[in-house]
């Protein structure tokens, strides 16, 4: 067989191996699959497009996309935290998407200026307290929880999770590094227990009286709302006399290496629609990025 014939066969095989199934999208996500699978099932019903999830931790997924490059199966990268999305954009793994639908549905401050990523839900991190031990009038701000009056009354989640890191970053922006350092040191002094690995564990400790007050994402409380065991837990919106409660996002972007950027963009557009936003908020107990969505109680 001549070399030219071998070359043609090789090119054909490579082309076939890289051919993309246009009826299949793959999302690399750090979100728990059960939180987004109902939405994706609904999308398949509407469009016939199947969406496959590959789950993992955000840093490892970002690195995997970068290493896989043109050979990656990832069409979309989905994660939590604006800082993580920003890092993905800076890493060069996300495509600039110019979508009139996304730009209309998602407020400017909740998306990347170049279209690399888009917020799909909002999550507020604020104060929750045991109403048997604390009066709402005693609460005010994140910073106030560093006051000695809260000694042996505070529970917190570990700072190894991005939620507290992002909250502290926002405090540094508002209060300055030195003041924020003093606040965090005050929190540590006021701890009633060792730190917990999850917001759910913290809420259980507050409800059980191991401590009186904590800082968590609101959807964790909402997911416990139907259980009478936790009926003594109450939410307090922090810093209402100043900058307001800290709000972060979950979001996604189309990968730079996707072989199906058009359909990937259409999925993000649908996730920003009123139908998807209402479903997302109802299932996950997070807040929609689109205004005017009914989120119930």
Where are these regions (language model features)?
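Short, low-complexity disordered leader/linker segments with a strong preference
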Residues: 1-24
